Structures are given as structure tokens and as C-alpha cells.
């Protein structure tokens, strides 16, 4: 039974060109995140391949120093995301992004818009160098 399910998954991945979509939309997503880095000092680095991406949050971009735990940056950012309509798991100062392989560029734009707004709000509350 599990082999049949695996074969069906492979069939769907091939039929819907999900590998190509992951590469194309992943590159677009990463470029959008790099644009956010230009506008938000809180972003120390953006890295990844395809749709597996990470955004590192820092208090000082030059030294890549994180935030003191008592600032609860991850918890506060999670709250900002929820307030702005995005459910996102932030467990540390690294946002790990792994959306579905079928994500579209317009959906990426929506996510990036909320990231932009939420990071902007958080940046006004914490000291960033």
C-alpha cells in the first residue's frame, strides 16, 4: 500500500512539474527575501536552495550577534505574524521556510508582504545596530 502511495506522489510531482516549480519559485522567493534584507537591518542573512530557505535575524548585522533571550524575539515575531495574518513557526532567531512545492509567486508575494510588515514592526521595538 505504501509503495502505491509513493508511486502516486511521484506521478503527481512529475505531472504538475513541481520540481521545476520549486526551483523557479524558490529562486524568486529567495530574491524577494534578499530585497527584504536591504530594507531591514534585523535580517543578517538569507540562504537556501529551492523552496528550503532560511532568514537569520540579528541585532547587529556586522557581527551577526543575535538577540538576548530575555527580549523573546522569536515569540514576539510569531505574535506579529499572527496579527498580520500569517501562521509561521519561529522557534529561534532563524526563520526556516519550507512551503508546499505547488506555491505560486503571488502566494510568495503575500508571504513576503507580511514578513516585511511584521519585521518592520518588530524592528521598532528592539535595538538593532
Model-predicted segments: where are they?
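Conserved N-terminal phosphate-binding loop of PLP-dependent enzymes in the Aspartate aminotransferase
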Residues: 1-129
Amino acid at each position: 500500500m505504501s509503495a502505491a502511495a509513493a508511486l502516486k506522489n511521484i506521478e503527481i510531482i512529475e505531472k504538475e512539474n513541481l520540481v521545476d516549480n520549486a526551483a523557479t519559485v524558490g529562486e524568486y522567493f529567495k530574491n524577494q527575501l534578499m530585497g527584504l534584507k536591504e530594507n531591514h537591518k534585523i535580517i543578517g542573512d538569507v540562504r537556501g536552495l529551492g523552496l528550503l530557505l532560511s532568514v537569520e535575524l540579528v541585532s547587529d548585522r556586522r557581527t551577526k550577534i543575535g538577540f538576548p533571550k530575555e527580549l523573546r524575539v522569536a515569540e514576539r515575531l510569531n505574535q506579529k505574524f499572527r496579527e498580520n495574518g500569517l501562521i509561521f513557526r519561529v522557534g529561534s532567531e532563524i526563520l526556516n521556510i519550507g512551503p508546499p512545492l505547488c506555491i505560486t509567486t503571488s502566494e510568495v508575494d503575500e508571504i513576503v508582504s507580511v514578513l516585511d510588515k511584521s519585521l518592520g514592526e518588530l524592528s521598532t521595538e528592539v535595538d538593532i545596530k
